[in-house]
Amino acid sequence: MRQRLLYLLRFYLLTVLTFIAAKIVFMLCHAADHPFSASDVLEVISHGVSLDLSTALYFLIVPFLLTVASLWLRLPRWLFVGYYVLIAVAFVLAFVSDTSLYAFWQFKLDASWLSYLETPTEAMASVTVGYLLLRLFLTMVLTAALTMLYIRIAGMPSYGHHSWREVLLDVVFIPLLVIGIRGGFGESTTNIGQVYYSQNQFLNHSAVNPVFSFLYSMSHQMDDLSQYQSMDDSLCSQLLEGVYTTESVAADTLLNTTRPNVLIILLESAGEQFATVMPHLQQLKKEGVSFSRCYANSWRTDRGTVSILSGYPSFPKISVMKMPEKSRTLPSIALSLQKRGYQTSYLYGGDINFTNMRSYLIGTGWSRLTSMDDFTLEQRHTSQWGVRDDITFNTLYEEIVKCALRSDEDGGKYLWGYSTLSSHEPWDVPQKTLDDEVENAFAYLDNCLYDFICRLRQTPQWENLLIVLTADHGIVYKDIDNTQPLQKNHVPMLWLGGAVREPRVVSRFCNQSDLAATLLGQLQLPHADFTFSRDVLSATYVHPTAVNNYSNAQWLVDSTGQILYDFDVRQSSISHSTDAERLLRLNKAILQVTTNDLKNR
């Protein structure tokens, strides 16, 4: 038993050390373009090791199974050597490819390089024969060297007998292996974003394990997007004419300044279906600009967050936030304001590594992140998902007042983002005002929000502040489900603060994703790169629509009615429109054009 454990431990540690060595070599190879210090190397290793530990466990599965089999069978030596050769080839190919391609791509190895195999001539056109031969030579030498290391250090397991203790050990080892691969017991599973820690993207990229990066992107491929191709692209363009207009022309003016400090709050799951238990929010609507027919783009926080902050559409079966190679190409409100001198920060009281949130936020211009790890141990466990909302609202208040005081001194501008989390299963909140636990959680959120607004209103910083309130998505609750999309997907969109010129209601159909263009239009800033975000107040917004998708279905509403099309069964489950055929074609065209854009990023 002891010898088997030592064998698995030797194999595992050698794999982890190989990954760490690859990080150091990667950094050294790019030192000329990306200088770093010795402390940077240590930080890259310390932040990246969690991903290395989990990735190494994937490759421990085969040795573990072989050692189990060896209790009953005398396995030939070539089985182990063959596996060592196989993983050595895989590792070295990943390391060499990653290190070589980074100079061209400036992002980590992912599955996108496979597309170049279809046109190898074009792929090799930008490099010399010597360049290729050198890398081929290095691959062969390093593969041989790594194989020898596995043979000499990991070696071969000794053969044992299938005693009950040996079998029990194997049974216990299996869940430990699964937990390690998953990344622990938390809500967040192992993902690339967990190793991001710096505003220097090179250091973040250095921390990422290239083998994991490739496997992760392979598991999030978009091969099934072909099912959304239903017509010629020229017909799509014709159908979409006037639907996605990016210009701000003669836009109505909502603000009394073009350079306010901006706060964007994403209210967890707080769809309009909970309006009756959120009376304070309804009162606030009378004091600001309420977009009364705003609809969520999707049904999950990761997708809604991207739609709100990047003005980008969501997709039925894909989360763009979970695809760093795609999300890093997106525009964002933060990037646009950062270019105008705004300092940006984001607060989320939960695990910011969940669904790759960290890498998305850093990659789209949010300079300073605050998450549950920045709170006390006691505060981190005040909610199932992390730090409960009354605590984080207070943290946000203190941050705004502190930053605004600095702004008064140096004239700087600020953009804050904040995601609440308590109004989510299991609905564990400290107050008990309603018997229904779900409604009680939203009443708690309503109280937290109102207390925050009242406190902020008493500060001098209120005068130049624009607060944008919206929900990340709606939820299925009681009799409101996916068969009632008008109710389920309806979310608040409210602009508040001293920067708002006067209260009013904007009653046009719109999506969360239209916030980016509408806000930047009000700030008189360009937003042409937000291809699918529309300035709702612009004279060019002549065809108001809203879209939402979930699972493998997409819903569309405009002035003629609504339609919900299920791509699994290839038929509409809802079709209530005076122009149903046109609306169906438009619905398909929207998804075809947006998925084409995603594939090309």
Report residues per predicted region.
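Membrane-interface soluble catalytic domains
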Residues: 190, 499-601
